[in-house]
Amino acid sequence: MASSIKTVILFLLPLLLAYSVLAAPDITDGGDKPGPEIDDGGGDKPVPGNNDGASDYAKPAFEPEFMGAWVIDNPNAGVAAMQLQLMPNDQIVWFDTTSLGASGYKLPEGTPCPINPDANNQPDCYAHGIAYDWKTSKYRPLTLQGDAWCSSGNLWPNGNLMATGGTFSGDKAIRVIANDDPKGDFTTKIGALADTRWYSSNQVLPDGSSVVLGGRDSYSYEIVPPQMEFKPKRFDLPFMQQTTEPPLGPGRPVENNLYPFLFLLPDGNIFLFANNRAITFEPATGKTVKEFPVLPGGSRNYPPSGSAALFPLKLTADNAPVIPEIVICGGNQPNAYELVDARHVTEKQFLPALQDCNRIQPMAADAAWIPEQNMPSPRTMGDLIHLANGDMLMLNGAKKGTSGWEDATEANLTPVLYTPYKPMGQRFKELTPTTIARMYHSCSALLPDTRVLVAGSNMHQFYTFDTEFPTELRVEKFSPPYLDPALETERTQIDPANTDAVLKYGKPFKITAALMEKQPLVLGEVKVTLLYPPFTTHGFSQNQRMIVPAITSVQNGVITAVAPPSGQIAPPGYYIMFVSHLGIPGAGIWVHID
């Protein structure tokens, strides 16, 4: 009899739980108070193979109580991080404008001062870029030729960094720094690009070349191969002029569509979002494949500067179709910049930033914007980055205003953990705040040790320190919740000597790993993630991409997984590979995919 009762209870329990979820009020503010009913933001039933985080493990993942922690990694790195790229040699390259005077890093005595063509051809004895060793916190100066102010960039398949565009003499430049030379500097080719690229965005393609798209008064894109010498070719892109505000032609100072959001889709097309509209297009021809509904609520690109990310691409061993999903958060009203910019007004009015997020599956036949749960607070100029275990982190930015010199106020000091696979009302979790404002011209990057490095912030035309939001030269590191000291024994350790460092498309690869106390890992409790390190600037992490390969076996401390099937899923190049145990990742290692 007892056995029969137990069977009935086990049968009814899932139904009761399902009813309780359906009967619960929708929550839209990230807190505990019910909000008005809205669309369920992708729903509580994620699409299989997409962002179904609940299916990552065969048992519940750990829920750390740790709220994160901040440390100062370096009290003065000398150069504000306007643009930032983590390289496979474990140096982080960041750089600033060269045309607006001194940085905080004067070149050592005896070092030749290069002539700066964008500063009246005078000798410039200050560094405007550095290579920062995240393991030692030491850094060295880099030389920039042609102003890289508000430029874009990406890694080549060999790990070299290519930075594209900027302004003045650098508006068509490419700058390359080699990955295999730990003491290397930029090699620059002025005038290499087909169009001026100031506030443009890059996206790496399946063959390792990259789309360089948009920029001020540049309604076009071009494809740049991973080499210094090439013949530039320009593709007209009327969509970029159509999304400019006001749409009256060159020389307008509002735009609202600079630093457009670009994502390579699994079908090889590019998803392009600018201002409040989106299309997909064929990069080889420029042909528009699909137009999407207008995203209501405001403008999402520079200068309102929202954030966007592609959810992790989850693969199966049998190469089932991958369903990509994109989220866009924050920004501001279309007129927000005009109300704060000195070229328009004498008294600034800082509008509250947007607090909403919206999701879309662009390859779906009926693709439409679905409201996500609101963020806990408004945010403009924030970063939205992948964490090692597949969760996401929002940080940096402001609660009011836009990008631009002195055009924002109320720094948003509180990072937010974003877990899009959880039920509505549980997807955002506010973490330990920093004490350092990271607003305009700040950046962040996930490190191989699973922490997040944060640098930069300069709200001013020149380096300015005696003000409410001073130019920020301190470097911080943030430990996310998964670095809970109480869960140290649940962390994984990869054995690099017995792990495949080169992954071939569609082929199995092996990882030797164990828990910190050498306990064996178990199938169903392990997840592998592969992160393509992004080029981050102005709230958008260009080329950011996380792949979750299928695991086929875990035996005797060896994980066997299947590499991504093609460059359309994972463009060739270097990735950081992490292994997580029930949501708790260990330090990653660099691997190469081709």
UniProtKB/Swiss-Prot annotation:
It comes from Artemisia annua. The N-terminus is blocked. It is found in: Cytoplasm. The keyword Hydrolase does not apply. Catalyzes the oxidation of aldehydes to the corresponding carboxylate by coupling the reaction to the reduction of dioxygen to hydrogen peroxide. Substrates include glyoxal and other aldehydes. Does not have enzymatic activity on D-galactose. Residues 28-56 are annotated as: Disordered. This is Putative aldehyde oxidase Art an 7. Expressed in pollen (at protein level). Keywords: Allergen, Cytoplasm, Glycoprotein, Oxidoreductase, Signal. Disulfide bonds: none annotated. It catalyses: an aldehyde + O2 + H2O = a carboxylate + H2O2 + H(+). Its EC number is 1.2.3.1. GO terms for molecular function: aldehyde oxidase activity. InterPro entries: Gal_Oxase/kelch_b-propeller, Gal_Oxidase_central_sf, Glyoxal_oxidase_N, GO-like_E_set, Ig-like_fold, Ig_E-set. Its main location: cytoplasm. Residues 1-23 form the signal peptide. The keyword Cytoplasm applies. One of its GO terms (cellular component) is cytoplasm. It comes from the Eukaryota.
